[in-house]
Amino acid sequence: MVRKFKTMDGNTAAAHVSYAFTEVAGIYPITPSSPMAEKVDEWSAKGRKNLFGSTVDVIQMQSEAGAAGTCHGSLQAGALTTTFTSSQGLMLMIPAMYAMGGQFLPSVMHIASRVVTSNHHSIFGDHTDFMTCRMTGYAMLMSSCPQEAMDLGAVAHLSAISGRYAFMHCFDGFRTSHETVSYTHLRAHETSLHLV
């Protein structure tokens, strides 16, 4: 098998693999995770098909709390659901995360981690946002480069589906999220269909 390489940043890599395994995406943009939601919204608008042969239903809400509520509701209805967030936005999702984690719903959150601070203008990379959520019932995966953002993103989705468990897939905001590198391209549609 010939290995194919592409050049992409961490946000796009996570969005690419997420799109393949998602039926509903509840979104609200927040830096540095906004490009993930924007890519999924763009691909959905262009009619791109996911692994299941349908277009992802993207629902933009009024806040991160609304996006988490959308995820909770659609997961209860049986749809594979994803969201993308960071920092203070993740803090607003915690109440819904306890519900989703406690109900063993196969949620996946892709988090471009950023410092949680009273000064919302800080762009420093930090893990306080997702570490605050460690007791919500979500399993945690951490990627350190764009290649891992794609690979562990797929692991998060496949594990959530097979184990009926909620996952946070985290990586450093502004470092991994915006780092552009060449990596081995995972063709989720071709390599993962037999795993679902």
Task: Describe each model-derived feature in a short phrase.
Residues 180:
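A contiguous loop/helix-start segment that scaffolds small-molecule binding in enzyme catalytic cores
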